[in-house]
Amino acid sequence: MSRFFARGGSDSESSSEDEQELYSDREEEEQFSDSEEESSEAESSEEESSDDEGAGASRFLKNVSESEESEDEERVTVVKSAKDKRLDELEGIIKAIENAEKINDWAVISSEFDKLNRQIVKVTQAGPTPKIYIQTVADLEDFVNETIAKQKSSNKKMNASNAKGFNAVKQRIKKNNKEYATLIEKYRADKDGFMAGGDEEPKPVISAPRISKVERVEAPVAVTATADDDGFATVGRGGKTLQYTPESILKHLRVIVESRGKKNTDRFEQIRTMEKLLEVAQNPYQRIRIYLTLISTRFDLTSSSSANYMSVDQWKLAQQEFSTLLSVLESNREYVVTEGAEEWEDDEKQPQVAAGETLHVPGSIVSYVERLDDELTRSLQQIDPHTAEYIERLSDEKELYTNLVRTQVYAEALTTSEKSDPRQDSLNRVIMRRLEHIYFKPAQVVTILEEGTWKSLPSNLASDITPRANSGEVTSLVQTLCNYLFRHSDGILRARAMLCQIYFLALHDQYYRSRDLMLMSHLTENIANFDVSTQILFNRTLVQIGLCAFRAGLVYEAQNTLSEVCGSGRQKELLAQGIILQRYSTVSPEQERLERQRQLPFHMHINLELLECIYLTSSMFLEVPLMAQTSSSPEMKRRVISKTFRRMLDYNERQVFTGPAENTRDGVIMSAKFLAAGDWKKAAEMLNSIKIWDLMPQPEKIKEMLSQQIQEEGLRTYLFTYAPFYDSVSIATLSNMFELPEKKIQAIISRMISHEELAAALDQVNNAIVFRKGVELSRLQSQIVTLADKSMNLLEANEKTLEQRTQGMANAFQRDQGAGARGGRGAGRGGQARGGPRFPGGQQGRRPGGQQFSGGALGGAIKA
């Protein structure tokens, strides 16, 4: 409720007489109003307004004489009654509740609701219940009901503090509103009419007529929203007049900018102020300055809220304002927003741009679009991906991508060809952002996105880097963006561009090209020197290459590529698709917060179940023949291709009862057991029955490839297992057994013979395989080879230990010279020192290489 203090009247009495009258009036007032609560406040003279008929009119009016004006020229004291102070406190609490509702901060709402109920008790002691309180509790109850409905339709849960506050408010609001049910019904029936009427004020009870020496008549003061003939105007905090004129725009903006980062700053009020300034802005410069400050203020709302991401409504408003800002800049080329420009200091006048000149405005268009991108990513991280809300939020990416392309076109017009130019760096950043939005998408999706983007852009906008005419060629688009970054950037941007291109090629089944680019980039050698986000992108690219190799039927390459990520058991963490919380983890809360910020949105995830299935299937094709080979060749037992697969297979074999396969992992293990037993048909049937293959492109082609691989590996397993029991075997028999062409069988056997995996020869005359006998080691020979291997391992370990202990001691074991000089042991006599025999003359022989430690008697026996 607005309260104004009017100055009125001009008395002809002297100042001394006036003072006496005031003092006498105050004494009489104290005598007649000791029982009243308002008399405790230091009120001005004897006036007491009887009935205020206008609800918005001020209740406290002060007559000031000319003498008082002369005394109060330097200081104006605003006197408020206790009731007005309580109403001010009530309005402050209500405003805090409204702000907390905008950001869904139920912890703040709960605490402020308690304060509100305590304050309303004090307010109602001196008058009726304020209508603003009825409005607040009614709207709060509606907001609680809306939140309950949203929680039922969404799987996303509140955090602990929010849920606690929400439950507390939900329980207390219904009980509280029962006391004001009648007033709340009136408010909901006609909200505007209810709030338009003033609060009914009780008439003050006058105990006795007041006697004063001078009777004063006060005229009612009308409160208006705009300036009138009496000099009244809308006032803000501190009694300052708020005037929004084109000339005062820069002053208002400077006040807003200077208040950034300070506590107790009402950013919503600042946003409303700038929206009003936009209405009175007259030239492009004013609109550009307002939009730059307005967008920054909307971003600041995130830092002051409990949520760590921008609300959807504020994000959309910021995105629309950013798009409007680009339109203003595109229409007025004489104004350029660039980093490092000098700020206009004179707020009294506007800068004038002569014809042909350019005015640089400080700011960063690229930083704004990057922040919009980051806020969208944070929002997608927080939303449950299995709800319609996620899909709806993801649709905002189209508008963001349009602004990215638009920003790129704007940056191209400002960029020079020098790498060191800050404008070139800005262009590189926005191109990198655009590339990161398309590298993981299929070509069909990117084509639709590009076509929609260029249709929504003005026809006069054109890009030299990515022309409008080539928007349909997705492969060419990615290649063009990457090549531009290769030429004009270095460091992290160049590495990320390379990884994005490799990922895109692997996603579209170009295995050999993506593999060659990865090898030529040498990123595998120095990826540890890059930041964590680039390492995550490297892991994603590596996994995509492995998946591409598997789709191409290159099982060995797929297993070898995927082993680094899948063999660690930390796929979620390495691919930034989840956090593995361990019981005794030493990760600090700050590290955990950073780890959560690095998580990728759900639509960018690689299916971990499919990834594990492909890795286990590839390991099965390599491990099962290897296990069959080592059963007859003990010297091969040390070879383990996949420890993960071996561990799962051993665990399954230890089970007393084995039921049917219940998940993808069990299906692969059961298929491996059938393959090891020689039943390749059941193995193929079990493997093809896994439903996850339907998630891959062309699933029938994948299943056909798997069946062929099982036939080939089944043949290899059969030969490794039963070779000791055959003298010869017909190729036609093997062809009928595994349903493979004879030429294919001959090729497989020839490869096994050339790799020395099979001791046999091809008899082309009889079309058969002849096995050689006596090549396999006997049991005793196998034990001797094992003992020799262990001894060599012990020798190598001893030499490494000696190297560590003798670093910087080159002559530590050259005892011949020192011992001879001291006349000690071994000097002048042909004794033997520890570690081996001495040569004639008392000098110990030194063998070339190593640290000259032979391993003692055992080492000598082995080397002999």
Curated annotation (Swiss-Prot):
The PCI domain, residue ranges: 602-776
Location of the region described as Disordered in the Swiss-Prot/TrEMBL record: 1-77, 815-864
Subcellular location: Cytoplasm
Composition bias type Gly residues, residue spans: 820-864
One Pfam entry name: eIF-3c_N
Compositional bias segments (type: Acidic residues): 14-54
Record GO terms (molecular function): RNA binding; translation initiation factor activity; translation initiation factor binding
GO biological process: formation of cytoplasmic translation initiation complex
Keywords: Cytoplasm, Initiation factor, Protein biosynthesis
Recorded GO CC terms: cytoplasmic stress granule; eukaryotic 43S preinitiation complex; eukaryotic 48S preinitiation complex; eukaryotic translation initiation factor 3 complex, eIF3e; eukaryotic translation initiation factor 3 complex, eIF3m; multi-eIF complex
Tree of life domain: Eukaryota
Main localisation: cytoplasm
PROSITE patterns linked: PCI
Subunit and interaction comment: Component of the eukaryotic translation initiation factor 3 (eIF-3) complex.
Function (record text): Component of the eukaryotic translation initiation factor 3 (eIF-3) complex, which is involved in protein synthesis of a specialized repertoire of mRNAs and, together with other initiation factors, stimulates binding of mRNA and methionyl-tRNAi to the 40S ribosome. The eIF-3 complex specifically targets and initiates translation of a subset of mRNAs involved in cell proliferation.
Family: Belongs to the eIF-3 subunit C family.
Protein's name according to its UniProt entry: Eukaryotic translation initiation factor 3 subunit C
Gene name in the database record: nip1
